[in-house]
Regions:
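Conserved alpha-helix/loop element of class I SAM-dependent methyltransferases that forms part
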Residues: 27-45
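Class I SAM-dependent methyltransferase SAM/SAH-binding core
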Residues: 50-52, 56-106
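N-terminal, positively charged/glycine-rich alpha-helical extensions of SAM-dependent methyltransferases
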Residues: 1-16, 168
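Class I SAM-dependent methyltransferase Rossmann-like catalytic core
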Residues: 11-29
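A short glycine-rich, Lys/Arg-flanked "PGG" loop and its adjoining helix->strand segment in the class I
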Residues: 131-143
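Core SAM-dependent methyltransferase catalytic element
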Residues: 210-231
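A short acidic, Gly/Pro-enriched loop at the edge of an enzyme's catalytic core
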Residues: 108-116
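C-terminal alpha-helical "lid/dimerization" subdomain adjacent to the S-adenosyl-L-methionine
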Residues: 150-206
Length: 231
């Protein structure tokens, strides 16, 4: 499916997109907490953050709340999602949050940043595009900058992948996810291009990242990071 097609899927029902997130990401608190923990504490009073595949601005809001002097640029390929993000931040200080419609897997990333983050987005692009993206993220980071990605991963074998899927269904239902929400999630998953965690951390190193860390892994969900060292 084309990027335009994927964007359409993620524009449908955007008003209620965040409501079932805690049920559909069974490890929600630990997952997002691990992303925030990997944002360096010693960056100073103000630093620039790029949020790839920002969607409705959920992760951007968490970053902004935990780092109140950060400046967050949110990019996404769905206009509807970005409209929801703009609404989320409509009462925030002028200029602290910016929004850009773009296909981050194909277009050059704008600006330069101390931190690049992403949550549950990069698994939508092909593996070759992931590798190109990691190189592009490395390019826009300042020396010492950090890339943190929290995403869905592929099981290392077909048996593990099937176990991940069945476990996700069971846990989502136990947490109260409705069948309509599960069906919508399954429909979106038809476009997924998940890769194993081992592959992704390898691509990070290929792109030039140092200190690549696998911080969190819970079946389908993982968080990892890397730092751009000075040449």
């Amino acid at each position: 499916m084309s990027v335009v097609g994927v964007a359409g899927l993620f524009g449908e029902g955007v008003e209620s997109y965040d409501l079932p997130r805690r049920q559909l990401v069974p490890c929600f608190d630990e997952f997002y907490g691990a992303i925030l923990e990997l944002v360096p504490a010693g960056l100073g009073d103000s630093f620039r953050v790029l949020d790839l595949g920002a969607g409705t601005g959920l992760l951007g809001a968490m970053v902004g709340r935990n780092f109140p002097r950060s400046e967050v640029t949110m990019v996404d390929f769905s206009e509807e999602m970005l409209d929801a993000a703009r609404s989320r931040f409509s009462d925030e200080s002028e200029g602290r949050y910016t929004f850009r419609l773009m296909d981050y897997a194909r277009e050059p990333l704008p600006g330069e940043y101390e931190v690049v983050v992403s949550a549950l987005s990069i698994h939508h692009v092909e593996d070759d595009a992931k590798r190109r993206l990691f190189r592009e993220v490395h390019r826009v980071l300042v020396d010492g900058g950090v890339f943190v990605n929290g995403d869905q991963i592929l099981g290392g074998t077909p048996e593990i992948e099937a176990r991940y899927h069945e476990s996700w269904l069971r846990r989502a239902r136990e947490l109260g996810a409705g069948e309509e929400d599960i069906s919508s999630a399954l429909r979106r998953m038809e476009t997924d291009k998940c890769a194993t965690l081992e592959s992704q951390v390898g691509w990070m190193r290929e792109a030039g990242f140092a200190s690549v860390e696998r911080r969190y892994e819970n079946e389908r969900f993982a968080v990892y990071s890397g730092r751009k060292d000075a040449p």
